[in-house]
Design a protein with these regions (language model features):
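Glycine-rich, mobile lid/loop segments that gate access to catalytic sites or pores
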Residues: 1-19
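C-terminal nucleotide
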Residues: 21, 26-176
Length: 176
């Protein structure tokens, strides 16, 4: 339903993670191997007990102008996967991806390759984050979240519009 609303009503080619997390509530682990029936697991955490408060920061940033940028993420990941005869990047062996870097940069461009680098690292990082939460290791979890934000900024490149380098408030928020 969330994806349908995002795709059809709002005309945006996204809509899986945010809506799923909102519907379940709290921290969730989502595996999208089967997009029609993703595996969703609620991770019970107690921020208060850990002495933490979850805050949403108003960066004054906007998603305006980012629809095309977001839409290119799966397109570029699928371009990389297609090089290996696969439909999606999760079907590609990471070692094979790295062995083919020069060719992939020529075929799909550097941004697509950087986004794929993020994908491989993020898939591993998510498992580590979930394990840290289950173990109550908040320092490890927060370190991994910071790594994720840094990777999103540098490799996934989904925090700013590439043609508007004057206004990058989300990038500023990640930096501080």
């Amino acid at each position: 339903t969330g994806r349908y609303a995002e795709n059809v009503y709002f005309g945006k080619p996204s809509g899986l993670m945010d809506q799923m997390a909102c519907a379940i509530g709290g921290m969730v682990y989502i595996d999208f191997e089967n997009e029609e029936k993703p595996q969703v697991e609620k991770i019970d955490v107690d921020f208060e007990k850990a002495g933490l408060t979850l805050c949403i920061v108003d960066t004054k940033g906007s998603h305006a102008g980012l629809t095309h940028e977001y839409a290119q993420i799966p397109v570029e990941m699928k371009q990389i996967a297609a090089h290996f005869g696969k439909n999606v990047l999760r079907e590609v062996e990471e070692k094979d991806f790295y062995a083919a870097l020069p060719v992939l940069c020529k075929e799909s461009g550097d941004r697509a390759v950087l986004r794929a680098i993020h994908f491989f690292a993020e898939d591993e990082r998510v498992v580590k984050e979930v394990n840290a939460l289950r173990a109550g290791d908040w320092n490890r979890f927060l370190k991994l979240v910071k790594e994720s934000g840094d990777s999103s900024y540098k490799y996934l490149q989904n925090v700013y519009v590439s043609r508007d380098t004057v206004s990058e408030p989300v990038a500023i928020a990640l930096a501080v």
